[in-house]
């Protein structure tokens, strides 16, 4: 026997659980004990035997990068837990706290939470954090006696509320076996209900933690999707545009930005004019599907995302670019602004090579990067001007094109002060 160290990633744990449930059951009385090393060896052997290495053999360069995009999108979640606090703050502000938004009444987050759990959003968040704390003590949160978390009679921390929360975010063995999402179902349903004993076990403390960033958004989305309409994506898109207006009002002068009036053919959403350069913004609120954010991504879903969001955005930006390039001499950057978050927007740009390599004026930017940019515009003018200058150089230089991530990294811009202080609802 040779003892060697093997790599086990956080997403491997979910896959091991999924494969165990998919290919076996827990009805037998006998229990086979194995060491962690033996389990990992069994998993690696099975994974290698089942791995389809042919699915990219005839794939295009775009599909290769879209595969990398899906793989890194899953990995990114485990490498940057701060993003979940930021995501919570952003979602909470857009869905709940920003009372002055023009389209505030489009989506009712309070009704969505009350419909599912029967209590307020604040109570929902409190129960979520309590369940996470219970899971940090024991992977079976419902085994905890009520007196551990219920200290007064008026508290929301009751056995019933804790149980209902865990059950709502649970999946059975049959759910996992039958779902087209496979292992990915555990990101939205991180508790597993066992066949034997009907116990509820946290698949991973990390994916329970991820509910902090995603839970409220998913509750509201699912509430409206059950009505069988496109109400949520359409109306959340309007709220996303309201959020961009809010950012502009917060950090820019009134004459530095405008909402672009739409004609027969839809163009870009916003124009920002900073004097030495202009930014055309087309905002897209759609998220990359869960079946793409994994180590073997669903390329059909990935292709749909690019067709409906990236390619369509580019067409809209081109229409507006033709109009505004005739109105002024300062250079114009076309910005596809995404609500979703990615570890590196360069991968998105390489995933539609024919567009981004053929147009050095077009960039992908996440909402986090945009928040940071406008914050610097008001609070660190010198650094903001350096960013604009580097974007202009990128657009006009004969050398290969760079991307927003690389520009920020070069300037050591990592922190996002916008979602701190008054915008930090997690600490309130």
Which residues are covered by each model-predicted region?
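Catalytic cores of nucleic-acid endonucleases
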Residues: 285-337
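Flexible loop/turn segments at secondary-structure boundaries
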Residues: 265-268, 287-290, 341-346
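A short acidic/basic microdomain associated with nuclease active sites
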Residues: 249-273
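A generic "cationic amphipathic patch" detector
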Residues: 261, 283, 293-294, 347
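Short His-Asn-centered micro-motif
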Residues: 260-263, 337-341
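Conserved structured core elements
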Residues: 238, 242, 264, 311-314, ...
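Acidic, metal-dependent phosphodiester-chemistry machinery of nucleic-acid enzymes
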Residues: 1-238, 242, 246-250, 254-255, ...
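Conserved catalytic cores of phosphodiester-cleaving nucleases, focusing on short active-site segments
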Residues: 248, 270-272, 277-285
């Amino acid at each position: 026997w040779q003892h060697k160290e093997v790599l086990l990633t956080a997403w491997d744990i979910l896959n091991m659980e999924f494969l165990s449930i998919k290919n076996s059951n827990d009805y037998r009385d006998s229990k086979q004990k194995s060491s962690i090393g033996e389990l990992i060896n069994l998993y690696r052997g099975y994974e290698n035997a089942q791995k389809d290495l042919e699915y990219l053999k005839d794939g295009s360069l775009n599909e290769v990068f879209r595969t990398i995009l899906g793989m890194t999108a899953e990995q990114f979640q485990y490498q940057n837990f701060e993003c979940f606090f930021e995501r919570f703050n952003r979602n909470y502000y857009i869905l709940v706290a920003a009372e002055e938004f023009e389209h505030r009444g489009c989506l009712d987050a309070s009704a969505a939470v009350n419909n599912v759990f029967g209590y307020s959003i604040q109570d929902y968040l409190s129960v979520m954090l309590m369940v996470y704390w219970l899971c940090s003590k024991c992977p079976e949160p419902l085994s905890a006696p009520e007196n551990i978390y219920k200290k007064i009679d008026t508290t929301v921390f009751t056995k019933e509320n804790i149980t209902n929360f865990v059950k709502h975010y649970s999946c059975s063995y049959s759910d996992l076996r039958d779902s087209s999402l496979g292992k990915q179902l555990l990101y939205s349903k991180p508790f597993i209900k066992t066949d034997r004993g009907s116990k509820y076990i946290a698949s991973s403390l990390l994916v329970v933690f991820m509910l902090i960033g995603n839970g409220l958004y998913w509750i509201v989305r699912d509430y409206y999707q059950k009505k069988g309409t496109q109400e949520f994506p359409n109306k959340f898109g309007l709220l996303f545009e309201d959020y961009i207006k809010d950012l502009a009002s917060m950090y820019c002068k009134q004459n530095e930005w405008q909402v672009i009036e739409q004609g027969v053919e839809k163009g870009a959403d916003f124009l920002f004019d900073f004097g030495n350069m202009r930014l055309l913004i087309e905002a897209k609120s759609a998220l990359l599907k869960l079946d793409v954010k994994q180590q073997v991504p669903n390329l059909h879903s990935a292709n749909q995302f690019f067709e409906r969001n990236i390619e369509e955005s580019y067409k809209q930006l081109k229409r507006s670019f033709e109009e505004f390039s005739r109105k002024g001499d300062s250079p114009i950057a076309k910005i596809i602004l995404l609500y979703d978050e990615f570890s590196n927007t360069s991968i998105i740009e390489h995933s539609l090579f024919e567009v981004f390599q053929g147009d050095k004026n077009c960039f992908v930017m996440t909402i986090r990067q945009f928040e940071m940019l406008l914050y610097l515009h008001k609070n660190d003018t010198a650094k903001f001007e350096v960013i604009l200058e580097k974007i202009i150089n990128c657009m006009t230089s004969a050398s290969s094109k760079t991307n927003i991530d690389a520009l920020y990294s070069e300037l050591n811009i990592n922190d996002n002060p916008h979602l701190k202080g008054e915008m930090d609802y997690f600490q309130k």
